[in-house]
Regions:
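Beta-strand-centric surfaces of beta-sandwich/beta-rich domains
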Residues: 1-186
Length: 186
């Protein structure tokens, strides 16, 4: 993550295993028929207690980014209100991938307060100004564009979180929500 600029921020995503009984990592190798083997490595560290002695408590899993996807659709031009995206403690970004280039504006509301309102053109300016490339038709709401850990949208304790998407024609889209979460809520 390019927004993790200090050692303490970078260590937030270290995967400790003291509280994990098993760990399974799955991947899709696709059409890599020529792949003859896969090698995995585990880096082990000794955790010290306050006196500098080895601690057998180890590191806990910590926090990590979770991505969940949802699909939505509406016929004709108009607005699509989405109010059923699950709320986690922190939202890093929402990425909208419609089947056709019909999104004209998106608003985000948290407890009836508008926290985002941008046309497709304005969103593209914001993203490209931060070094991102936006594919035609896609819409991104990224709260970490300023590279500051802690600028995520806080959703913990909120009772209302919704998107209002204005679209110029029939819309069918997949929304990807990126959360900062911990092992207990994964």
């Amino acid at each position: 993550k390019r927004f993790l600029t200090s050692a303490s921020e970078a260590s937030i995503f270290n995967y400790g295993t003291s509280d994990v009984p098993t760990l399974q990592i799955r991947g899709d190798l696709g059409t890599q028929a020529s792949l003859t083997g896969l090698t995995a490595y585990s880096l082990e560290t000794t955790v010290a207690d306050d006196n500098g002695e080895p601690s057998f408590n180890g590191n806990a899993l910590g926090v990590f980014e979770k991505v969940r996807n949802f699909t939505y659709s509406a016929s004709g031009a108009g607005t699509l209100d989405i109010d059923n995206i699950p709320r986690e403690a922190f939202l890093n970004a929402i990425h909208l991938f419609p089947a056709a280039d019909v999104i004209t504006n998106v608003e985000v509301f948290v407890d009836n307060v508008k926290v985002w309102d941008a046309s497709k053109e304005r969103m593209t300016e914001v993203c490209t100004g931060s070094g991102r490339t936006v594919a035609a038709g896609d819409y991104h709401i990224d709260f970490l564009l300023n590279n500051a850990l802690g600028s995520q949208l806080t959703l913990a304790g909120t009772s209302d979180f919704r998107l209002r998407i204005t679209h110029s024609g029939t819309i069918s889209l997949t929304a990807y929500a990126q959360y900062l979460t911990d092992f207990a809520t994964a």
